[in-house]
């Protein structure tokens, strides 16, 4: 590399020279995601799914029906099962029943909120929820992180 300086040129001339030295892309090809790194997308790529896909727990705690808790604050709930990320609870949940639920676990349809463990008092297979819970409290909604049809790669 030479240490010699060239005389400055006008910006328009520099832009023209730069654009003239660039090869325009005139064709496209389909490649696997593994081979796409460092390439330019020919079109916007959109998500085909919502993430998360379902309602899921945002915290570790106990899944309950918020209306049932509101009707009887500090109610004693019977813990009838556990839901973990990748291992949903698939039993039937009745009145006065709760499940222990971990962050990322799919919410059962009978429950609409999660009480954080810090707001609960557990003894054996029962739990008292000491906090007031609104509907959808401590839950992630489908599409909260990534909405279906959202552009994930721009052209």
Where in this protein do the model-derived segments appear?
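Short, low-complexity N-terminal leaders and the immediately following helix N-cap/first helix
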Residues: 1-73
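Short, glycine/charged-enriched hinge/interface segments at domain edges or termini
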Residues: 2-6, 12, 62-155
């Amino acid at each position: 590399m030479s240490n010699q300086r060239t005389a400055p040129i006008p910006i328009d001339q520099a832009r023209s020279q730069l654009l003239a030295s660039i090869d325009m892309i005139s064709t496209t090809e389909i490649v696997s995601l593994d081979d796409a790194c460092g390439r330019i997308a020919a079109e916007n790529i959109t998500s085909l799914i919502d993430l998360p896909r379902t309602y899921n727990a945002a915290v570790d705690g106990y899944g309950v029906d918020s209306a049932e808790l509101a009707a009887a604050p500090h109610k004693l709930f019977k813990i009838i099962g556990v839901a973990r990320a990748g291992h949903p609870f698939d039993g039937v949940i009745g009145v006065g029943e709760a499940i222990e639920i971990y962050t990322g676990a799919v919410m059962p349809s009978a429950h609409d909120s999660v009480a954080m463990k810090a707001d609960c008092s557990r003894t054996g297979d029962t739990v008292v929820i000491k906090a007031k819970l609104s509907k959808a409290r401590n839950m992630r909604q489908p599409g909260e992180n990534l909405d279906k049809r959202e552009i994930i790669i721009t052209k």
